């Protein structure tokens, strides 16, 4: 395999990367995430293997020495150590199908950075960024079709989400591309045709960003533009830019002031986008999810300050510091919804410093005097970093934003001139006869274990869920067992769906032998999951619910009590525990448990309903009448569980 062939493979893979955001397949579980992630990993592994051979053959394609490379290696090293010392190593390395992150993804990002920064020259970067901008133009068109109602918005509501299935993910994609487009607009300012092309593209990107209604990204854009304008207000290189910057500053100030004056008008209140900004208040901030999970993250950091808990282990912090008042929010958080706090929890102080160093060194490299970025280009890249950094105060990163961020880092890195090990030359024959076979074997092994097996597990899982929807329960049981055996990656989700759907399969009309086989598999898988994650409340709760549903009350009680000890403020645990006591005909114990759940947060209506049900079963008429007065007649009449309780006690 010669150098030209290797270069062709690398370039083909790199130019395929901007198309990854469009990949969505219903054949995969979490199609908006896993389709993109598996394609990304395969591409990176192929180009990295080809690059290693190319770098061995030609010293010109070896990494460039710079602070950026060393900072990235430090960051990867720290997160690697945090993975080794994490609460749950498997979670930290593999992540899950819903996120597809973990240390495995960080390794792929590092490999991508090394490859693209080593092989691309300025002309290649121009083509690659323009390919990415062309892709963003297609995404704009897709989003406009969503606005027009031609294409369905997958997450529901009015916020466009493109092919991401999440408006926030689309927002940061557009945010980054707006600044990249501005960079090329400036570079093409003397080309009237391209000037119009880039201007129209920016308008489309801004409109798309606006209709994602993502506050952090929109405010990040305004803040980033403000920084660009401030940095150019005294630009000595270009008088026109100075005037434009002054005008931009005035426009941003007028825009902010005008919105403030109009925030209580019907026009703003009736706008699905503007109303999200006018509704920002101290009350909203105090009652929202971040007001709970951010302090949790700080407490988690205090407990493990050096290397953190490991990626994907926020769940342990969440369960430990959970507050009963969080019943209003989604039941489980796996992120702090703040990138910096997420890294603080995942990799400790060293990890977050490593992450922040990537921003700092990028700024250092572009603003130092011995590079060939113009003042305007420096300010645009600075504005991009500022906008992205602000956006990340309110969200967590995802694959595509990581790819774009690491691409920017690599772009800055590629301008460095000092090449590592430039004077070391290896015989071509040795590379072909020794290095090539060794790399091929390693590539095939990791390709099989990192991609093929997880892919098979993912496909089996989605086939199982489709079979359940079609009530083909025998096939569903077989697919779940196959998914579990295919790979360790994604296994928590496979076990979760196995446990949640077990009762449907076991009470269906499939042959008894098949039921017994599935039951044996399901019980073994659930208990193995508990063994692999011994201190995770969510897993203990899952096991307790499964064992209760299958009639193993004593075993269920053990796991539910463990879940309660791990997460004493979680009402859902008490609901399951109380239901178990009712099934065990220990109704007074059930009432006591339901009372505890109710007392945790008396304003929680679901807890009040469950408490009423407990009172009905326990025959406590005084308590029953008291709780009935606290609930509306419509609530009582429409709740099948209340009617069922009255039926069971013969009333």
Residue ranges and their predicted role:
Residues 24-38, 55-62:
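Short, hydrophobic transmembrane alpha-helix segments
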Residues 159-160, 224-225, 243, 256-302, ...:
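Flexible juxtamembrane loops connecting transmembrane helices in multi-pass membrane enzymes
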Residues 116, 166, 282-284, 289-333, ...:
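TM-adjacent membrane-interface loops and short helices in multi-pass inner/ER membrane proteins
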Residues 460-651:
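C-terminal luminal/periplasmic domains and tails of membrane-associated envelope-modifying transferases
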Residues 1, 60-65, 236, 371-375, ...:
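Membrane-interfacial, low-structure loops and terminal tails that flank and connect transmembrane helices
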Residues 2, 8-27, 41-52, 72-85, ...:
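Alpha-helical transmembrane segments of multi-pass inner-membrane proteins
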Residues 23-34, 86-93, 152-163, 288-294, ...:
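Juxtamembrane membrane-water interface segments that cap and precede transmembrane helices
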Residues 260-272, 432-474, 489, 493-497:
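Hydrophobic alpha-helical transmembrane segments in integral membrane proteins
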């Amino acid at each position: 395999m010669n150098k030209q062939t290797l270069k062709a493979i690398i370039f083909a893979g790199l130019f395929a990367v901007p198309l990854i955001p469009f990949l969505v397949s219903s054949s995969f579980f979490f199609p908006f995430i896993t389709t993109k992630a598996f394609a990304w990993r395969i591409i990176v592994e192929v180009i990295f293997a080809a690059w290693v051979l190319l770098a061995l053959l030609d010293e010109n394609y070896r990494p460039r020495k710079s602070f950026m490379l060393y900072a990235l290696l430090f960051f990867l090293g720290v997160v690697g150590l945090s993975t080794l010392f994490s609460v749950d190593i498997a979670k930290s390395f593999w992540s899950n199908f819903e996120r597809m992150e973990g240390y495995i993804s960080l390794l792929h990002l590092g490999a991508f950075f090394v490859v693209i920064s080593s092989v691309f020259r300025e002309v290649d970067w121009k083509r690659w960024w323009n390919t990415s901008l062309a892709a963003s133009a297609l995404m704009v068109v897709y989003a406009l079709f969503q606005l027009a109602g031609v294409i369905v918005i997958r997450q529901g509501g009015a916020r466009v989400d493109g092919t991401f299935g999440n408006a926030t993910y689309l927002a940061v994609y557009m945010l980054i591309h707006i600044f990249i487009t501005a960079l090329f607009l400036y570079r093409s300012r003397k080309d009237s045709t391209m000037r119009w092309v880039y201007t129209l593209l920016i308008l489309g990107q801004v409109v798309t960003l606006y209709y994602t209604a993502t506050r952090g990204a929109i405010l990040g854009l305004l803040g980033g533009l403000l920084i660009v304008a401030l940095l150019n207000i005294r630009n000595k290189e270009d008088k026109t830019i100075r005037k434009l910057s002054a005008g931009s500053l005035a426009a941003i100030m007028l825009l902010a002031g005008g919105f403030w004056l109009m925030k209580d008008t019907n026009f703003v209140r009736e706008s699905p986008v503007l109303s999200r900004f006018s509704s920002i208040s101290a009350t909203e901030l105090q009652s929202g999810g971040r007001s709970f999970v951010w302090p949790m993250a700080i407490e988690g950091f205090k407990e493990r300050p050096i290397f953190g808990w490991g990626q994907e282990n926020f769940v342990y912090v969440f369960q430990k510091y959970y507050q009963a008042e969080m019943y209003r929010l989604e039941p489980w958080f796996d992120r702090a919804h703040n990138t910096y706090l997420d890294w603080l929890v995942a990799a400790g102080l060293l990890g977050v410093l490593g992450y922040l160093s990537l921003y700092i060194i990028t700024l250092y490299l572009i603003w130092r005097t011995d590079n060939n970025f113009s003042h305007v280009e420096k300010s645009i890249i600075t504005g991009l970093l500022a906008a992205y950094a602000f956006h990340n105060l309110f969200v967590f990163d995802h694959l595509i934003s990581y790819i774009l961020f690491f691409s920017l880092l690599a772009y800055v890195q590629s301008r460095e001139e000092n090449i590592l090990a430039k004077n070391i030359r290896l015989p071509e024959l040795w590379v072909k006869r020794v290095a090539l076979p060794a790399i091929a074997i390693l590539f095939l092994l990791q390709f099989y274990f990192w991609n093929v097996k997880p892919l098979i597990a993912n496909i089996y899982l989605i086939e199982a869920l489709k079979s359940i929807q079609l009530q083909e329960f025998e096939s569903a049981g077989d697919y779940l067992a196959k998914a579990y055996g295919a790979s360790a990656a994604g296994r928590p989700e496979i076990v979760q769906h196995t446990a949640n759907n077990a009762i449907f399969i076991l009470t269906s009309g499939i042959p008894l032998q098949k039921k017994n086989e599935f039951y044996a598999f399901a019980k073994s898988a659930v208990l193995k999951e508990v063994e692999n994650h011994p201190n995770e409340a969510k897993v203990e709760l899952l096991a307790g619910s499964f064992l209760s549903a299958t009639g193993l009350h004593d075993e269920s009680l053990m796991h539910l009590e463990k879940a309660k000890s791990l997460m004493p403020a979680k009402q859902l645990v008490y609901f399951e525990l109380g239901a178990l006591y009712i099934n065990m005909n220990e109704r007074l114990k059930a009432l006591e448990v339901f009372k505890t759940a109710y007392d945790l947060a008396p304003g929680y209506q679901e807890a009040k309903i469950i408490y009423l049900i407990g009172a009905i079963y326990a025959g406590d008429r005084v308590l029953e009448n008291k709780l009935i007065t606290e609930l509306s007649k419509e609530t009582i009449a429409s709740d099948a569980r209340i009617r069922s309780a009255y039926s069971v006690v013969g009333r």
